[in-house]
Amino acid sequence: MSVVYINIFLAFILSFMGLLVYRSHLMSSLLCLEGMMLSLFVMMTITVLTNHFTLASMTPIILLVFAACEAALGLSLLVMISNTYGTDYVQNLNLLQC
């Protein structure tokens, strides 16, 4: 394993640990999820480019599309919760009746 893969894997692990530690606020959780998606995107792109996988060349783009959809949905939930309750606590997600 090269140093680049180890650094990207550590970035993924740190984002995952941040998701576990800072799970009370929705904004912190969304930022940690974006960090995880970014490190996965970079790792998949480097893997496809170094191993010359022609069939898997679209998978990083598909992952980026899913990350954009996840970010849009998360931000819309954040706006709805902050307008309704005034805070961005994750525990308010259980109270939504939509």
Curated annotation (Swiss-Prot):
InterPro entries (UniProt xref): NADH_UbQ_OxRdtase_chain4L/K (IPR001133), NUOK/Mnh_C1-like (IPR039428)
GO biological process, one term: ATP synthesis coupled electron transport
Subcellular location: Mitochondrion inner membrane
One GO molecular-function entry: NADH dehydrogenase (ubiquinone) activity
Transmembrane segments: 1-21, 30-50, 61-81
Any matching Pfam family: Oxidored_q2
Catalytic activity, EC: 7.1.1.2
Subunit structure: Core subunit of respiratory chain NADH dehydrogenase (Complex I) which is composed of 45 different subunits.
Family of this protein: Belongs to the complex I subunit 4L family.
Name of the protein in its database record: NADH-ubiquinone oxidoreductase chain 4L
